[in-house]
Amino acid sequence: IIFINSANIPYSDDIYLDGNVHFIGTQGVGKSTLLRAILFFYNADRQRLGISVEKQNYTDYYFPYSNSYIVYEVATENGAFCILSFKSMNRVCYRFIHSPYRKEFFIDENRVAYSESDRVRAVLDQYGIEYSRIIYTYDEYRNILYGNSTSPEFSRYSLMESKQYQNIP
């Protein structure tokens, strides 16, 4: 998982979740922030993240700027791909990217995140990387992730086929 200008984290690409993980740290260092981002990857449900009503909502906290991104790199038996999450029209949106994570897709040579997701798209075009259209709804995102999309272009991005994904906490 990669945070770029997200949740008070300027940049972090060293969070590996491909084995056992143990988070420790004092209060306020980001343990719950990271856990909620992981949970949101699987359930894409802002209401089921355990964020109290007194706190900033998921969208505003994790995506405060036009260049705030969370990139999930997913490794499957068919290779790696990324899921870019970002804010558009005041909601979290997604774009599936048919490539492993590469910093230069999202950050320029001056170590500044690209200002908008359209700039990311232009860079992907420059590198000849395939990517999906923007996914605007959580339902469509979950259907793609869990193999229930009716569009064959998204089959390579499914983790598994499950019609019961709504049962994920």
Description of each model-found segment:
Residues 1-134, 141:
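Extreme N-terminal "head/tail" segments of very large remodeling/mechanoenzyme assemblies
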